[in-house]
Amino acid sequence: MRIEVWPDYGPQNSQPIFDAFIKSLRNAGDEVLINKKTKADVAVIWSVLWLGRMQQYRKIWDEYRNAGKPVIVLEVGGLRRNESFKIGINGINRRADFANQTFDDRRWPLFKHTLKPWNTTGDIIVICGQHDASEQWKGLPRMEQWIEEQITEIRKHTTRP
């Protein structure tokens, strides 16, 4: 398989991850083309946040997705940030295919993380958002509007700040 990999536009912390990914592709016998536009079978980019250095990825994303070709997206992990990493097909988080239809339970202990019970008490409520320049936010309202909507909904259920 011919695979375009684009480390040049990734953030500073992405280079070792790209290097390891490129090595694994080559070890599998794939033809890897680095930072070269070649109309390959697959493209590999870092994140779907179209800001700063990474805004160059949007052209690659659009070209491959519009052609019906897959884009592999490398990204920092949600747990142990900058120690764990995600690899998704055609997106990240809920929009990605992680090819994990079958998996075992051997990876979870590697995180050395114990889940704590959900906290239903406390003095404040924290609303977490997403950067609205991300492909993940495509088609959704501006972040400011979304946060206002969440506050309105939460106030129907509690008086906590």
Protein language model features and the residues they cover:
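Hydrophobic beta-strand scaffold residues
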Residues: 32, 70-72, 161
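A nucleotide-sugar donor-handling region in carbohydrate enzymes
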Residues: 69-140
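Short alpha-helical segments and helix-capping/turn motifs at coil-helix boundaries
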Residues: 30-31, 35, 53-64, 110-114
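N-terminal pre-catalytic "stem/leader" segment of glycosyltransferase-like enzymes
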Residues: 1-51, 133-134, 144-145, 159
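Anion (oxyanion) recognition and catalysis
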Residues: 26, 65-67, 155-156
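Donor-nucleotide binding loops and adjacent catalytic segments primarily
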Residues: 138-161
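Glycine/threonine-rich flexible loop motifs
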Residues: 52-56, 136-141
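A short, gly/pro- and small-residue-rich
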Residues: 52-79, 148-149
